Amino acid sequence: MTTAFDIADIKRRMAGAVTSLKQELGGLRTGRASASLLEPITVDAYGANMPLAQVATVSVPEPRLLSVQVWDRGMVNAVEKAIRDSNLGLNPNTEGQTLRIRIPELNEERRKELVKVAHKYAEAARVAVRHVRRDGMDLLKKLEKDSAISSDDMERLSKDVQKATDETISEVDQTLAHKEKEILSV
């Protein structure tokens, strides 16, 4: 009789927080080139702001080099301007319809700043997971109060929710540790 409570939905919502964290961390600049570094950039194209991925192809030919192949020759200057204005500290060199972006080494101070930002993102993900947990527990309490589930079911499902929370927060911590190691490695 526990049809009103779906643990799979709770797990899916918690996994969404981890996915969001991974996307945010992917946008943090480390010392290595990564195509995801340019994902948040929007280009003023054809009278609208468009994601860079809709006007160009980004590739990583070398560990410290990004290559941006612009599809429309008329968009090269707009793409270059968008990359320069992105606050990522990147300086593209134009060669025809291709922009080459050398990724500079990060200094120690900038690395520490990036680690702090990564910790903020991870904490936001943990908070999101805890909110999902709270929502699940509130629903369980309501179902128990309305006699839709027994106290034994309440106990079992509460443990399932807590287990899912612990597993997800552990995944957040592992993701953060991996990114921190990546940022701090010279």
From Swiss-Prot:
<dbReference type="InterPro" id="IPR023584">
    <property type="entry name" value="Ribosome_recyc_fac_dom"/>
</dbReference>
<comment type="function">
    <text>Responsible for the release of ribosomes from messenger RNA at the termination of protein biosynthesis. May increase the efficiency of translation by recycling ribosomes from one round of translation to another.</text>
</comment>
<keyword id="KW-0963">Cytoplasm</keyword>
<keyword id="KW-0648">Protein biosynthesis</keyword>
<dbReference type="GO" id="GO:0005829">
    <property type="term" value="C:cytosol"/>
</dbReference>
<comment type="similarity">
    <text>Belongs to the RRF family.</text>
</comment>
<protein>
    <recommendedName>
        <fullName>Ribosome-recycling factor</fullName>
    </recommendedName>
</protein>
<dbReference type="GO" id="GO:0043023">
    <property type="term" value="F:ribosomal large subunit binding"/>
</dbReference>
<dbReference type="GO" id="GO:0002184">
    <property type="term" value="P:cytoplasmic translational termination"/>
</dbReference>
<dbReference type="InterPro" id="IPR002661">
    <property type="entry name" value="Ribosome_recyc_fac"/>
</dbReference>
<dbReference type="InterPro" id="IPR036191">
    <property type="entry name" value="RRF_sf"/>
</dbReference>
<dbReference type="Pfam" id="PF01765">
    <property type="entry name" value="RRF"/>
</dbReference>
